[in-house]
Regions:
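Active-site-adjacent alpha-helix immediately C-terminal to a catalytic or transition-state-stabilizing loop
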Residues: 12-13, 59, 70, 129-160
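A short local structural element in Rossmann-fold oxidoreductases
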Residues: 16, 62-63, 96, 107, ...
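Loop-to-helix element that buttresses phosphate recognition and phosphoryl-transfer chemistry
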Residues: 10-64, 115-129
Length: 161
């Protein structure tokens, strides 16, 4: 089985340097260009399945990467980006200013720290592992997973164990 990992293209929140895992933000102009570049890569690959998170930016990216290929795109919330809770939509500098104690805890223990109303990196990894365990049971050749940088790191982490 071949698993292709594709991160969504640029968004305005990316450009601003914000944490925005749970915000449903679409691609910006550069993100659309990046999606069209991905289409060239996937043009000659026969994909059996395509998975995206439930965020619009991954759906937009997958559609651009598929080009004219007609196929079902499966949304799965287990591959959503980390929920940064109250940190959503804020830059690191803003988080340091508005949440100084929490920011220090996050810096000291980033894997286990849970932002207010959010989730930890460990919780993200558990979600992603559950998703990947299901993927490994499939009898298919080529899968595209269009997701987020944190999710892609968690996929690599799950494959190490």
């Amino acid at each position: 089985m071949n698993i292709y990992l594709l991160r969504h293209g640029q968004t305005e929140e990316n450009r601003k340097g914000s944490y925005y895992g749970n915000l449903d933000i679409g691609l910006n102009e550069i993100g659309v260009i990046q999606g069209n570049k991905a289409k060239k890569f996937f043009n000659d690959i026969k994909l059996d399945r395509v998975y995206v998170s439930d965020k619009i930016r991954t759906l937009e990216m997958a559609k651009l990467a598929l080009g004219l290929k007609e196929m079902e795109i499966i949304q799965d919330s287990r591959i959503n980006e980390t929920n940064f809770g109250d940190f959503e939509g804020k830059t690191y500098e803003e988080i340091k200013m508005f949440y100084p104690k929490e920011c220090l805890c996050w810096t000291d223990n980033w894997k286990e720290f849970v932002p207010p109303q959010g989730e930890s990196y460990i919780e993200l990894c558990k979600r992603v592992k559950s998703f990947m365990d299901d993927i490994k049971r499939l009898d298919v050749h080529n899968i595209l997973i269009c997701a987020h940088s944190g999710v892609i790191r968690a996929i690599y982490r799950s494959e190490e164990h």
